[in-house]
Each structure stands twice: as C-alpha cells, then as structure tokens.
Regions:
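The feature marks proteins involved in alpha-glucan
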Residues: 26-54, 97, 104-183, 211-214, ...
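Short proline/glycine-enriched turn/loop motifs at strand-loop junctions of beta-rich domains
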Residues: 69-75, 189-195, 236, 865-867
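Conserved, mostly hydrophobic/aromatic
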Residues: 188, 243, 309, 356, ...
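Active-site-proximal helices and loops of the catalytic beta/alpha 8
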Residues: 207, 211, 216, 220-222, ...
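Substrate-binding/active-site clefts of carbohydrate-active enzymes
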Residues: 312-333, 344-512, 520-541, 545, ...
Length: 934
C-alpha cells in the first residue's frame, strides 16, 4: 500500500526557485572568466556521494513516472532539493530533501507508449503537477519501509516530463540568435536550468575569446516554455557569444556550463564561440546568389541518380585546382578543373544530384593547425608503414568523413578558406552550391541527426550540457545509448525533433539544398520524418527529396521505442531507403565482412562461374543453387524492391517479392519504386573494385575486372528506383582495401578524376579497422603491379557508365514512378541453362496513353558468366531489335584511353526470332525500331 504525506511548509518552499541561493553565485567577474573558457565548467555544488546517480525510473509525463519499486515498500516518495545533496542510503532515513511528495501507485494507463518501454515497473502518480521551478533542482524517487528507511532510490529520466510540461509552449519558439528590426534577440531552451547568462564578446571575428572583453548579461526565463531570452537594442551581426548555464548534471552536481548555441548559424574557428549572423546579409552571399536556380532535372524520386562525394576528396589532390582552394568549398567554383570537368560530363550524361558527405560543423577535424602525415620512404604495397604514419596523427590530421556532429546548422570550417570568418564560411558554402547548380547538378546533404559526437560533460558536448538527460536516448539505467557509434539523440523527444526539423529547413531554404540523405534514419521516428518532409516542402515551396539508411537495429529495433523511419515502415511516405538486397547479392557476403568472409562470392564476383581459391573445392550444385538465390535478389533490385511485383524465384515459382527471402525478412519491402535507393558501392565498406579484388579469382585480368565493374554500375542504372553511385565508382576507385576509411587520412581516400592514378596498393589499410583481415588482404596487395587499375581501365568503365546514364536519362521506362507502372511494364524472362544471365523487358504498350513511356519497348541483358550466353525469349520475337543508340560510340573499332571501345559489344544481339546472345561479363540494352524512332 502507498502512504501519503507532505512536508510542512511545502507550498512556501515550492514558491522559491530551486537553486536560487545567492551563496551559489560567483561574482560577475568570475562569470566573465568562465565565459572566456571554451567548454568551461564550474561545479557549484558537488553531487552527494549518498545520492544515486543512475536513473532507473522515467517520467511518463509531468505527473506520472514508471519505476520497478520494491514490492515491500510501504511508501514511494519524490524527493526534491535545490542542489544534489539528498542522502538516500539503503537502510537509513532519507535526508537532505527539501521536499517530499507522495507518489501513488496507479494502474498502468493505455497512453504509456513504447517510448518508455525500456524502463520496467509500475506507474506512480503525483496529486498535482510540479511547478516549473521544481525541475531546476535535484530529484530522486525513493521507496521507504514502514519506519521511513530507504529500501531503494534512483534518479528519474526526465524527457517525458519536459515534453509534457514545457514543449507545448516551446515547440514554436524561435531559438538561437536572430536580428529583427535592429534588435538582436537571443533564446535558449533550458527548462531545468536555474540561471543562464549570455556571454557577449566585445569584438567580432577574433578566434581567441581571451583577447577581448566580454559582457555578462542575465537572461530571463518564460516559466511556461522553459525558454530563456535576452534582447539587445542593437544589430550585433558578427559578434561572438556563448551561454553560461547553471544546471544540475546527474552524477556531477550543480554545474555552471559555458556552452555554444545549439542553434548557432555562425561559429568561429574550432567552434569556440557562436557568432551572430543574418543569412540574408549580402556578406553571406556569393555574387549571383539571388539568381541561383537548381537544375530542373528531377520531377520525382525515380529521376534521381546520385553521386556521393566528400568535399575534401573532391579536390585535395587535384593539381588543376588553385592550391588555396584544394579540399575547400571553393574548389567547386573553378569550372575548368579536372574534377569539375568530370562532374559536368556526368551531369551531361544524366547524373542529377551530388550528395555531399557531412558538411555541418563537425567535431573531429581541427579547423586550425591540422597536420598531414608524410608518406614514409619504406611504404610499400603490402606493408603497414603508411597506415602507421597516418595512425600517429589521425586525431589531429585534416581528414574525417564527418559523421561527428557538433553544431547542426553551420557549415564546417575546415572546408572554408578562413574558418574564423563566420560570414565567409556561409558565403563559400553557398558558392559551392551555386557552382554545382550551374554545372547542371542538384545538391544533397548527408545529415546526421541520430547522434552527436559527445554527450555528458564532454568538451564537444553541447545539448547535454544545457538540458542534461533530455536530448539523448537513454537506456534502462539512464546512460546514453550508443548503438549508432556515439551518443544517440532522442528525436522522439519534441525539442530534439524540433532541432532536427528546423535544421533541415535552414539547409533547404537558406542554402538551397535539394535533397537529404539521413544517416541511420531508422533510429528516428517515422512521425518526425514526415513532419520534417512537410516542413522543408513548405519552407521552400517545392518537393525536397528525402532518403536515408533505414537499417533496423539497436535499442529501437523492431519498433521498440516508436514506429521507426526504417525499411518497410516508411511504405507509402515517399521517403526512400537504401536497399541491401541487390547490393549483397551482387557483391557477395554482407556489409562489414571480415577475415575469411571477404572471400564469399556473389553474382558479380564469380560465384559458381569463376570460383576463387577459397571456393574452388565446393560442389557445383551447391554454388549453382547459391547463384540462383543471388540472382533472384538481383531481380528484386531491378524491379524496385516492390512488395507486390511478381516474378519467378530461385526455384522458378512465380510469387510477389514480399515472399522472396532476404535473411529473416522479406526481400521486397517498398510500395512505390521511388522509395528504394539502389547501390552497389558507397562510402561505407569496401569499394566495389576492392570487394571484387578480394572475391574474384586473383588471376582475373584487369580488363575483366573492368567489365565486372561495369556490370555493377549497370545494376544500379537499369534498376527501378533511385540510382546511387559512390564518387569514383565510375573510375574503379580503390581505397587499398580499406573497409572503413572515415579516419584514414587523404591517402586512402584519394581519387583521381582523370583515372590515371589509383590508391590501390599504397599499403595495408589502417589497422584500427582492418588488421583482423590483413592475412586475406596482404596476398592481394602483393600483386598490386598487376591489379592496380590503369588509365585505360578507368576510362572504359567511365565511358560505359556515362552511356548507361544517358540511356536511363532518355528512357522513361527505366524511371517508372509508380508501382502500377512497374507491374504493368516490367517482366523478367527465364533463361536456358545455368544462372548468371538476367534478361529484363520493359513494354510501354501496357502503360496508359498519357504516360511518357507509352508505346516504348526496351530489353536489357546482364551476363556475369565469363562465357557467351544465349537464350530464346519467345515474347521478344516478331520485332526488329537494335542495340541502344547510346551504345554505338562504344561499339566502334579502334579506340584509345580517351575514347575506349568495347570489342565484345558488337556480338550482343537480339534477333527477330527472340534469340538473345550476349558475350561474357557484358551488359547490353536493346530497343525496338519503333522506340528508336520516337
């Protein structure tokens, strides 16, 4: 049974702000000193050693919490104190609490959603909601016996309460620093803070706060929203600022944290201070920004073909770029460089979008004084010298992919020519966008809202030092979940969702970003992503295309906390997810393979038809069955991974793709073709060339490896859905077998847009992610002299890729935008003999007369068998078929490095009797005479 009691004088105590004691406050000059210390923290009152720090209870709303209290408890109380000084030792009396509020066990209501399912126990309720000031101090839930002794006690996860008590009034608040009518307004959401001061630095633009004076201005809180504000009757653009936040940090104490603004629009170098910016200021805009227009190349998702690119990779080693701009945003503004000529050629062929790896302010690259390691004199193709040199400086060097968010709304400073100039960062980023638009390419951003680089009191933690325990997803003990790699954010929390959505709006509206790729999107709620879609569309007046990694894992797996933005769950939303079905079937094995698993072969890499040494002794019947299974998943991918598209499986049985199996789940999982992203390579894991280097037989010659690369690219470009290519995939890019080059420096991430040089064989890949696979990698790298792609090999793949891009651009049959159109037009044909040959037919005669593909007919064949294959397809008989006109330049005799030729292509035929013949390791696209004339 639960007892109730009130502490005498409770009403009077609640009327005073918790933590408002004057003795806790240092003098103003001391606060100025804290202002001048980046990520400074002063403990005002230490955490009591007798106060439990874990948080095994969770607020459901502002009145109810869930906790597994001991069954023998006579009463359960909420203990409150202005500082973390509560003494709750098991077997002793509860002490140090300024207030005790009775909690009553109540039936578990139906509205306790999945968000709190990670915390077990019963539901307890207060009689009345706490006043706003109660959330500013320390609190415990305590179970007492009949004599008032502590049986158990724990901290309480606070997000549910803050969402109920403050978020309704705060969700529409304008946060950050804004200039309105000559007045600069600062706003920060921090409902658990007991005091906040604004640090306003006297001089703009300086890197070192210590060099100038600072004003400390008290901010005022709105009790309903928890938003702290301060207005200055002046236009403060260019001025640096920070906040001093007095807040209780579990396990640490009442702390004064010096933090930057999570809603910063500008920063100085290394994110020491936030900078007041107006994104409409001409100083933030390159010349011609007002007239910038995105290319009108994409009407729907399926028109998109994306090239995934890292800003530094693009130009760091391009000697045609001015030295000061190499590795910078401004490299894209030089149209006559090797990189821009290459991108423009891809755009002319049909590439629609560049997707940039993270470009927000990231935590892992010094924006000043980064170092670049020298290549050791003894570095060789198969030794560890180069990776050791990189490893010695990798935490201080100039390279990282950037999946380490620090501030979400500010361009990364290491890509700017002067990271201390906040307006310049913005101007140079916009100049990059403008230059890509002028080259015929839309611009997408890879965004990472699923985690931050640090949490808690870490130096590069921001959110958790302002509202501890709110912005990050917690486990059953109250520790931050890290399944993404780092500190998982809780986008199911109202104000974290607000931050994510408003951040995306800033990039789409103010930087004219055309699409977004969401890293680990499955860790975000579907509802938040739908709200984000509505917000970016409304802010820009156009459709902003969203796609992301819909992987299902971690603490949110299978909807444990909410309906995820994951594969299958997003059906019907128009938000696309990457598909691993065709990717794994084509490459062999699974993403992240290590050791002997790197020899597992797939449809592209020699399964059954070209066994490598590890697979040479396997029974042919076994490998043929595996190839049939892989080929079934190839058809799944080519058909857009649609749930209800029907074709034959590995056993020849006609069934919907939802009944094809991929691991433990369905292979087909989307409801519309625009909801799937097809790829065979991206920044993660081995490049396609490197994967094939490990999986194909070692004696496979380079010209055959080039043909396999073309087949891998063809799978992407002939498939229904969104096409996705990794930068350099069209040039046989290698990372010298590095499976995870996020922190491997410039050398392993090298790309040469002319194709003349390759990173293959520069050395064993870095030990920190690859050493367990060195025994499998070393023999391959030892043959670098014969396996390193040559200029002619890269050119062959590049010209083939551009031809396939042109075919996709010109053929609406390859970009069908509805499930009904795909179901009506596409069919696959069974082939004679062994698997290894895929024949697809697209017949536009089945489409409505108003459809742009109506009446057109197209067939394609993909042969992964090294031998010539032929098959009779009765339904293709009775027509005059010809190879697609865009393939003719590749058929011509002769050839050179600049204009390579495919000597086998002329042998690809589809005759009027329906007899199709295609050379080994080849792709061909055929159209009818009538289609050609249209």
């Amino acid at each position: 049974m639960a007892a109730r009691f009130l502490l005498l004088g409770l009403a009077a105590v609640l009327a005073a702000p918790l933590g408002a004691q004057a003795s806790d406050r240092p003098a103003a000059d001391a606060r100025s000193q804290v202002c001048a210390t980046h990520a400074g923290a002063t403990v005002l009152a230490a955490w009591s050693p007798a106060m439990p720090a874990p948080q095994r209870a969770a607020w459901i709303d502002a009145k109810r919490l869930r906790w597994a209290a001991p069954a023998t408890a006579e009463s359960v109380v909420l203990a409150l104190a202005p500082t973390p000084s509560i003494v709750a030792r098991e077997g002793a009396a509860l002490d140090g609490a300024a207030q005790r509020l009775a909690l009553t066990r109540v039936p578990s209501p139906g509205d306790v959603d999945r968000r709190f399912s990670h915390v077990a126990g019963d539901v307890f309720a207060l009689d009345a909601a706490l006043p706003a000031t109660a959330w500013q101090g320390a609190m415990l839930v305590v179970a007492l016996d009949a004599e008032g002794r502590v049986l158990d006690a724990t901290g309480i996860q606070i997000a549910g309460a803050l969402d109920a008590a403050f978020a309704p009034a705060a969700r529409d608040a304008a946060l950050g620093a804004r200039i309105e009518g000559g007045i600069t307004r600062f706003a920060l959401w921090a409902p658990t803070a007991s005091k906040i001061d604004l640090c306003l630095f006297d001089a703009p633009g300086e890197a070192a706060a210590e060099a100038t004076g600072v004003q400390v201005r008290a901010m005022t809180v709105d009790a309903a929203s928890g938003v702290w504000t301060h207005a200055v009757d002046a236009d403060l653009r260019g001025r640096r600022y920070a906040f001093l936040v007095d807040v209780v940090v579990p396990g640490v104490g009442l702390v004064r944290n010096r933090v930057t603004d999570p809603y910063s629009l500008g920063l100085n170098a290394d994110s020491r201070e936030s900078v007041v910016l107006d994104l409409d200021d001409p100083a933030t805009q390159p010349k011609g920004w007002a007239s910038d227009r995105r290319p009108d190349t994409v009407q729907g998702h399926t028109d998109m073909v994306i090239h995934e690119l890292h800003v530094r990779d693009f130009s760091r080693d391009d000697a045609t770029v001015p030295e000061a701009h190499r590795g910078k945003y401004l490299a894209f503004t030089h149209p006559d460089t090797a990189g821009m000529r290459h991108l423009r050629a891809l755009a002319d062929a049909g590439l629609t979008d560049i997707h940039l790896l993270p470009t927000y302010d990231l935590a892992t690259v010094p924006e000043r004084d980064c170092v670049s390691p020298r290549r050791p004199a003894d570095a060789a193709a198969a030794n560890d010298a180069l990776q050791a040199a990189i490893g010695a400086v990798r935490e201080r060097d100039c390279y990282n992919w950037g999946y380490d968010p620090w501030h979400f709304d500010v361009p990364e400073g290491s890509y700017a020519t002067n990271p201390d100039d906040a307006a310049l960062r913005v101007r140079e980023f916009r100049a990059m966008v403008q230059a890509l638009h002028a080259a015929g390419l839309r611009v997408g951003l890879d965004v990472v809202y699923n985690h931050t680089f640090e949490s808690g009191q870490g130096r590069q933690s921001v959110l958790d030092r302002i509202v501890p325990g709110y912005y990050h997803r917690l486990n059953a003990e109250g520790a931050v979940e890290t399944s993404t790699c780092c500190a998982n954010t809780a986008t199911e929390a109202t104000m974290m969702a607000k931050l994510m959505i408003e951040s995306a709006v800033i990039w789409a509206r103010d930087y004219r970003i055309d699409s977004f790729r969401f890293d680990l999107m499955g860790h975000q709620p579907k509802a938040a992503m739908l709200e984000l879609q509505r917000a970016v569309d409304a802010a820009t007046g156009r459709r902003i295309h969203l796609l992301g990694e819909g992987w299902n894992f971690g603490e949110v797996q299978n909807g444990a906390r909410f309906a995820q933005a994951a594969q299958g769950v997003l059906n019907g939303t128009g938000i696309a997810t990457f598909s691993d079905r065709m990717r794994d079937a084509a490459r062999g094995g699974r993403a992240g393979d290590r050791g002997e698993a790197l020899h597992a072969q797939g449809w592209l890499s020699g399964l059954h038809h070209a066994p490598n040494a590890a697979n040479a002794g396997r029974p042919r019947a076994e490998t043929e069955a595996e190839l049939r299974q892989a080929e079934a998943l190839i058809r799944v991918g080519l058909a857009g991974t649609l749930v209800d598209f029907e074709t034959f499986d590995a056993d020849g049985v006609i069934k919907p793709l939802s009944e094809f199996r991929y691991g433990d789940g369905p292979a087909g999982y989307v409801s519309q073709p625009g909801e799937v992203v097809n790829y065979t390579e991206n920044h993660d894991n081995l490049t396609l060339f490197d994967s094939n280097a490990l999986r194909l037989p070692l004696d496979t010659p380079l010209h055959e490896r080039a043909r396999v690369q073309v087949l891998g690219n063809a799978l992407v470009l002939l498939a229904q859905g969104v096409g996705y290519l990794h930068a350099g995939q069209e040039l046989m890019r290698s990372k010298s077998l590095d499976r995870n080059s996020f922190n491997s420096g410039d050398a392993f991430n090298f790309v040469d847009w002319t194709g003349a040089r390759s990173a293959f064989g520069i050395g064993l890949p870095p030990a920190w992610d690859n050493e367990d696979s060195w025994p499998q990698m070393r023999p391959v790298l030892e043959r670098a002299a014969e396996l390193t792609p040559r200029a002619e090999d890269a050119a062959f793949v590049n010209e083939w890729t551009k031809a396939l891009l042109r075919i996709r651009r010109d053929e609406p049959l390859l970009r069908l935008d509805t499930r009904d159109a795909v179901r009506a037009a596409l069919r696959f044909h069974a082939v004679d003999g062994e698997p290894g040959l895929v024949i697809g037919e697209l017949d536009g005669r089945a489409l409505p007369p108003t459809h742009p593909a109506h009446g057109r007919r197209l067939a394609y064949a993909l042969n992964t068998d090294p031998r010539t294959r032929s098959s009779l397809v009765a339904t293709l008989a009775g027509e005059t078929w010809t190879r697609h006109p865009e393939l003719r330049p590749l058929e011509a005799t002769g050839g050179s490095v600049e204009a390579p030729r495919d000597a086998r292509l002329g042998d690809a035929r589809l005759d009027a009797n329906g007899r199709l013949s295609i050379p080994g390791r080849s792709v061909a696209v055929f159209v009818t005479d009538d289609t050609f004339r249209r």
